[in-house]
Structures are given as structure tokens and as C-alpha cells.
């Protein structure tokens, strides 16, 4: 992962308003950030932001009231030693939180070493929580997939398939039936948690849907505010195919999945043919997926019913289990 764009300046710009940050000194060190090794070795964003801790030198160090009080109780010699050790570790930047006054020696050393020093009236815990969430978002695995991403019955559904199969037309039909558009053509996905992938629309394509023969349609203007969504969690992939290939199964015994950013996402395959109402089929697939998420598997229930019928000697469907 390229971490060159993640530095003190970018983090300050993105969080200054939210965290009420002020840049006290060390402006020359605006390019300070995280090394690739530090990010690669971090198990989570918690490894990159935390309370003052000299054991983890390469993370963002936050000094709250407890840390400042501890510093004030030290002897001059211990203060100087701790400050020298802290600055020598070259953290990306320091934050003095809780409205506490930054110790003069800390300000002096940050100025001399070009170490960015921020201050904020917010508590250290609030600053750490916010920065951890921010870091987890910008460092999360990302991917851009081709397709139409929709909110169907509250579920994030990605329509995929070869060009010319009518994905955008199908998306338009589903939007006209009351569902919402997230993104068309290019969808930005990011894995923000261990069990979900979130999809958004690139800013350039916001609210737009391209339909052959009609060109670009502004869905928000045509259908209203409720016809578009800012983001959705990806739960289902619907692949459109022109004709079934050798792997197509009429009644798949096992659920199909597609790996997206290391997370298995449920997948259904629908054949595109004349006379088929694809919008109804997609809605049915979504409803069936919702049932499966609730533990209701229609195919498994039918197989159990069939097995019981074959085992019943009085059944009109006698058979022998293999």
C-alpha cells in the first residue's frame, strides 16, 4: 500500500474541523507519516494511534491530562530525558489533548526537530477514537468493480455481466420500481470491517446512470432524492449471462460466492433471454437471499421433505436413498 500521501498535513486537513485541531509548531515536518513497514505490521488502526507510549514510537502519540500531569511531577532531568527520547523516536506528529497547555520544553524540541505538534480542547480518548476510525478508513483494502450497484429492499446488490447485456437498463427498471442507485459502471468498494464491504460511487459519476440510446441520466433529478443512495454494504452479486456455460446449475446444491477484498459475497447467476422479466427475478433473488441470511433455505427444506417422503413406506413417492 502506498502511504506517501498519508502525512501530518493530510491528516490535519481532514480532521482539523472535527477534532478542533490547532497546529502549534513543527510546520516544516508536514510530510511526516507512516512507513510502509509500520502500516504492513499494524494489525489494526489501534497500532497507529494511541496514548503516549515510548514502546510504540512510530504511531501518533496523544498526550492527555494524565500524561501532562505525570510529566509535571517529574524532575527536570527526567523531563528532559523523556522529551529527548520521545522526539528521537520520530513519531508522525504529537497531539496535546484535553485543552492542556503544551509543556514549553516539548514545544521547543518539536520546533527544533520539525516534529508537528497539534493541540485540541477535546479529550484524549475522543481524539484517539476519531483518529483510529479515520486511519482504518483510509488504510482499508480497496477495489473498483464494474457493474451497477443498487439498494434493493435494503440490501446492497451489484449487477455484473458482459457489456451489452442490459445491466443499466435493468438498473433503470429496478429504480423505477422504487429501489435506489448507488453507482453505475464503476463502483468503489472498501473493506471497513472484518465482515462487511462497503460500496460507494466515485464523485465524478455521482447520481448518473448511462443507458444505451438515452445517454447519461441524472437519477436524482429524474426520480427524486429517494432514488439515490450514498453508500451500501455489498451483500449480493447478481451475474447476468447470455447463455449458461458448462458450470451453470439449475438447482445449485451449494451457495455460490465471489471473493471481494477477501470476503465471500453471495452470488446468483441469471440468464438473459427474450421474455424474461429480469427485474422480478432480481427482486426474487434478493428476497431469497434475505431468507437465507435468516437461516431459511428453501432448497434444503425441499430436500429434507423429499428424503422423508422417500423413507415413508406409505408415501406415493416411494424410493430408495442412495
UniProtKB/Swiss-Prot annotation:
Catalytic residue list: 146, 167, 185 (proton acceptor), 250
GO annotation terms (biological process): regulation of carbohydrate metabolic process
Reactions this protein catalyses: [HPr protein]-L-serine + ATP = [HPr protein]-O-phospho-L-serine + ADP + H(+); [HPr protein]-O-phospho-L-serine + phosphate + H(+) = [HPr protein]-L-serine + diphosphate
Top EC class for this record: transferase
EC number(s) stated in the UniProt entry for this protein: 2.7.11.-, 2.7.4.-
Cofactor: Mg(2+)
Binding site for ATP: 161-168
Description of its domains: The Walker A ATP-binding motif also binds Pi and PPi.
Primary role: Catalyzes the ATP- as well as the pyrophosphate-dependent phosphorylation of a specific serine residue in HPr, a phosphocarrier protein of the phosphoenolpyruvate-dependent sugar phosphotransferase system (PTS). HprK/P also catalyzes the pyrophosphate-producing, inorganic phosphate-dependent dephosphorylation (phosphorolysis) of seryl-phosphorylated HPr (P-Ser-HPr).
Misc. remarks from the entry: Both phosphorylation and phosphorolysis are carried out by the same active site and suggest a common mechanism for both reactions.
The family this protein is said to belong to: Belongs to the HPrK/P family.
Name of the protein: HPr kinase/phosphorylase
Annotated organism of origin: Burkholderia ambifaria (strain ATCC BAA-244 / DSM 16087 / CCUG 44356 / LMG 19182 / AMMD) (Burkholderia cepacia (strain AMMD))
Amino acid at each position: 500500500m502506498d502511504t506517501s500521501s498519508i502525512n501530518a498535513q493530510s491528516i490535519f486537513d481532514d480532521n482539523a474541523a472535527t477534532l478542533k485541531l490547532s497546529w502549534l509548531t513543527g510546520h516544516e515536518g508536514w510530510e511526516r507519516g507512516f512507513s510502509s513497514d509500520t502500516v504492513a505490521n499494524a494489525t489494526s488502526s489501534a497500532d497507529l494511534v494511541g496514548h503516549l507510549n515510548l514502546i510504540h514510537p512510530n504511531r501518533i502519540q496523544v498526550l492527555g491530562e494524565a500524561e501532562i500531569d505525570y510529566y509535571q511531577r517529574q524532575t527536570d532531568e527526567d523531563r528532559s530525558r523523556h522529551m529527548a527520547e520521545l522526539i528521537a523516536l520520530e513519531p508522525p506528529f504529537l497531539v496535546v489533548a484535553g485543552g492542556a497547555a503544551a509543556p514549553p520544553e516539548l514545544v521547543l524540541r518539536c520546533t527544533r526537530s520539525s516534529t508537528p505538534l497539534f493541540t485540541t480542547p477535546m479529550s484524549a480518548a475522543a481524539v484517539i477514537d476519531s483518529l483510529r476510525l479515520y486511519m482504518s478508513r483510509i488504510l482499508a483494502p480497496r477495489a473498483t468493480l464494474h457493474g451497477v450497484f443498487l439498494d434493493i429492499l435494503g440490501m446492497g446488490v451489484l449487477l455484473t455481466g458482459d457489456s451489452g447485456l442490459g445491466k443499466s437498463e435493468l438498473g433503470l427498471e429496478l429504480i423505477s420500481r422504487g429501489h435506489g442507485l448507488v453507482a453505475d459502471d464503476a463502483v468503489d468498494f472498501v473493506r471497513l470491517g472484518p465482515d462487511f464491504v462497503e460500496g460507494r460511487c466515485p464523485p465524478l459519476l455521482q447520481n448518473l446512470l448511462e443507458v444505451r440510446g438515452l445517454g447519461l441520466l441524472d437519477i436524482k433529478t429524474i426520480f427524486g432524492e429517494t432514488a439515490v443512495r450514498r453508500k451500501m454494504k455489498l451483500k449480493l452479486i447478481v451475474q447476468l449471462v447470455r447463455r449458461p456455460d458448462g458450470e451453470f446449475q439449475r438447482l445449485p446444491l451449494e451457495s455460490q460466492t465471489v471473493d471481494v477484498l477477501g470476503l465471500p459475497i453471495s452470488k446468483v447467476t441469471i440468464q438473459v433471454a427474450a421474455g424474461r422479466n429480469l427485474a422480478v427475478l432480481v427482486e426474487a433473488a434478493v428476497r431469497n437471499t434475505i431468507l437465507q441470511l435468516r437461516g431459511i433455505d428453501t432448497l434444503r427444506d425441499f430436500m429434507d421433505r423429499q428424503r422423508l417422503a422417500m423413507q415413508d413406506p406409505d408415501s406415493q413417492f416411494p424410493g430408495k436413498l442412495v
